[in-house]
Amino acid sequence: MDSKFFKSLSLAASVICLVTSCSKKLDEAYQNPNAAVRQPVENIFPSLVGSFSGSASSAGSSYGNGGDGLLVGRYIQYWNNYTLTNTDNGGTQYDQMGGTIGGSDNLGSLWGAFYYGQGQNLNKVIQWGSEEQKWDYVGGALAIRAWGWLELANEYGDAIVVKQAFNTNLSQFAYDPQSLAYDSCRAAAYKALTYLGMTGGAVSQGNFAVGDAYFYKGDVNKWKKFVYGILARSFASLTNKAAYSADSVIKYCNLA
C-alpha cells in the first residue's frame, strides 16, 4: 500500500512539474546561448540604417531598396539586361510581354527589409531606448519606421499589412489599404519629431553617433530634416486625391 501511495504521489508531482514548466515560453525557457537576450540599442541601430539599401543575415539577405530598385528600373524601362536567349530575356522584363512568374521573391526586398530586417529589431530600439531614456535613439527608430511605411505604400499599394504588423502570434495576415500606410507613416513621423526634440535623460549626440556612425553621426537636427522630407513626400503622394494638401507639401519641403 505504501509503495502504491508513493508511486501515485511521485506521478502527481511529475505532472505538476510538467504543467508548471510549460508555463514558460520557449524563448524564456531556453535562452540564446550565442548572445545576450538584451543588446545595447547602440548595437542594433546600425542594422536599421543599413537596411535602407540592403542587409545580410542567416535567415535572409539583400533586403532593402537596392534589390527592388534594380527591378523597378526594369519595370519603368530605365534599363534592362540581355542574355543569350530570348527566353532568358523575357524573364528579366516587366511589361505585357514578360515578367517574373513562379516562386520568385523579386520585388520583395523592401517587404523583407521592413517586416524582417527592421521589424522587431526596430521595436526593441523603441522599447529599450524608452526604458533607458535614450530619446534620440527612439526618435531615430520612429523616423526609420515612418520611412518604411512610406516606401511600402508607394511600392505595394493596397497589399500592405498595417493593423496586424509585427504580431508574433499570427502566421497569416490581412492586407490593409494604402491610405492606412500613409496615415501610419505620418503618425510615426510626428512621434519621431517629438522624441528627437527631447533633451533630457540619456540623450547625447556622442552616444547617438555610436549607433548612427554612417548616416547623420548623431545629429538630431539632420534627423528632423529627414523626417520633414518623409512628411513632404507622403503628402506629395496624394496629388490625385481629394485630400491633397499642397500647403503641407510646401511646408515640409521648406523644413527639410
Task: Tell what function each PLM region has.
Residues 38-42, 81-256:
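Structured, solvent-exposed acidic/aromatic patches
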Residues 11, 50-57, 127, 194-197:
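Generic surface-pattern signal
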Residues 22-80:
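Membrane-proximal, proline-rich intrinsically disordered regions
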